[in-house]
């Protein structure tokens, strides 16, 4: 129980940090893209990186913290950017990551018994990138489908789905690249010890 609470708090804090950084970057238009309002913020959606990393490394323990961040992040940061029904669409966002991880596990299944509880080692980045690609595509479809059903005034469009998929992909890659640079720098300056190096 204590482990689940620690994971939930860790996941929530990291996800909210990603929401905060993402919102500041898109609000101040750091890239200077001067895009139309509906495009702002969705071209590099950092919270998707938090979803993928937290689920890949903390598995199902991360879902409460991720869902809490999905429903409170927009409210605490800037609720006007989100449509009605976002708390339901957040389930679709989380399901896209869970489904992507399970698909990667299924494609790696060895002959014999297949199990949803089979471990996947994400230390090899190619599986992590595969999860990012699949979850970005699924998230673009699922979230837009759910929002179009809930908000009958908005229709689902291929451009919006594509924009969501690209934004989720770029956001997840940005989060992973940033963390990689940070931890690589800490290891190189010997502020942390590389776990792969034996004494």
State what each model feature region is.
Residues 62, 75-76:
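Short alpha-helix boundary/capping elements
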């Amino acid at each position: 129980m204590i482990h689940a609470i620690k994971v939930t708090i860790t996941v929530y804090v990291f996800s909210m940090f990603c929401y905060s950084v993402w919102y500041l970057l898109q609000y101040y238009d750091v890239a200077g893209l001067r895009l139309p309002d509906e495009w702002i913020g969705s071209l590099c959606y950092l919270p998707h990186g938090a979803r993928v990393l937290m689920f890949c490394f903390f598995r199902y323990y991360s879902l409460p913290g991720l869902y809490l961040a999905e429903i409170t992040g927009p409210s605490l940061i800037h609720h006007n950017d989100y449509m009605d029904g976002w708390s339901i669409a957040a389930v679709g966002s989380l399901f896209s990551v869970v489904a992507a991880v399970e698909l990667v596990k299924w494609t790696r299944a060895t002959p014999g018994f297949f199990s949803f509880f089979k471990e996947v080692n994400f230390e090899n980045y190619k599986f992590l990138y595969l999860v990012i690609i699949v979850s970005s595509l699924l998230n673009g479809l699922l979230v837009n489908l759910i929002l179009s059903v809930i908000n009958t005034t908005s229709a689902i469009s291929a451009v919006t789905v594509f924009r969501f998929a690209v934004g989720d992909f770029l956001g997840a890659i940005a989060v992973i690249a940033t963390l990689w640079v940070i931890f690589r720098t800490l290891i190189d300056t010997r502020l942390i010890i590389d776990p792969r190096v034996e004494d």
